[in-house]
């Protein structure tokens, strides 16, 4: 059961994973994290669980996030397993299968120097000096892990007209052009989260 069904829902919730089933018989749940940064899931004092709506579903409304206190959580291979307050048997844990796990951004531990939470990189303008002076070439749409390091998926953009907004560059079929950039020191020169900007030396040739 939720710890507080009527608790005010934070406005800064970040989805960090999905519950993919029960773990054991004592009410523990197993979570598949969305990224390698699962330490936030393990350290957060509360999770907010939401049942999302499939993209093709019609007439279905997503459930409101409900808060569950985390009694304990630990890594289990590539997953995270956790005991939530009020969930005491396998049937209750299985009932949570498929729910999105969200955590308030305010609960994230402070990142170490030269380390960044992936969620903070999404939406940053991406610049490169590969052709000389730094130029904005796109925006970070997604961050994922390739097993060795993080990868930025950058949607390429055209330079905006005066007073306008950047627009995606597209191929002959109208699909947005993208590039994948290793998030490593050899190519990422600077990250300024306050300015929402990432500078690199990555070439933009496709």
Curated annotation (Swiss-Prot):
Residues 113-206 form the PRC barrel domain. It is found in: Cytoplasm. The keyword Cytoplasm applies. The PRC barrel domain binds ribosomal protein uS19. This is Ribosome maturation factor RimM. Its main location: cytoplasm. The keyword Cytoplasm applies.
């Amino acid at each position: 059961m939720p710890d507080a069904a009527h608790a005010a829902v934070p406005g800064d919730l970040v989805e960090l994973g999905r519950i993919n089933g029960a773990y054991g018989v004592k009410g523990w749940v197993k979570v598949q994290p969305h990224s390698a940064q699962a330490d936030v899931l393990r350290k957060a004092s509360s999770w907010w669980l939401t049942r999302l709506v499939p993209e093709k579903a019609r007439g279905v409304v997503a459930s409101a996030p409900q808060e569950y206190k985390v009694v304990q959580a630990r890594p289990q291979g590539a997953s995270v397993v956790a005991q939530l307050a009020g969930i005491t048997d396998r049937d209750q844990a299985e009932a949570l299968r498929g729910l999105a796990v969200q955590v308030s951004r305010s609960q994230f531990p402070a990142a170490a120097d030269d380390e960044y939470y992936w969620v903070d990189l999404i939406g940053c303008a991406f610049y490169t000096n590969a052709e000389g002076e730094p130029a904005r070439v796109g925006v970070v749409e997604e961050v994922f892990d390739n097993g060795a390091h993080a990868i930025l998926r950058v949607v390429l953009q055209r330079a905006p007209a005066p007073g306008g907004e950047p627009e995606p560059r597209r191929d002959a079929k109208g699909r947005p052009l993208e590039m994948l950039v290793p998030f490593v020191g050899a190519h990422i020169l600077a990250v300024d989260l306050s300015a929402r900007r990432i500078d690199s030396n990555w070439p933009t040739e496709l």
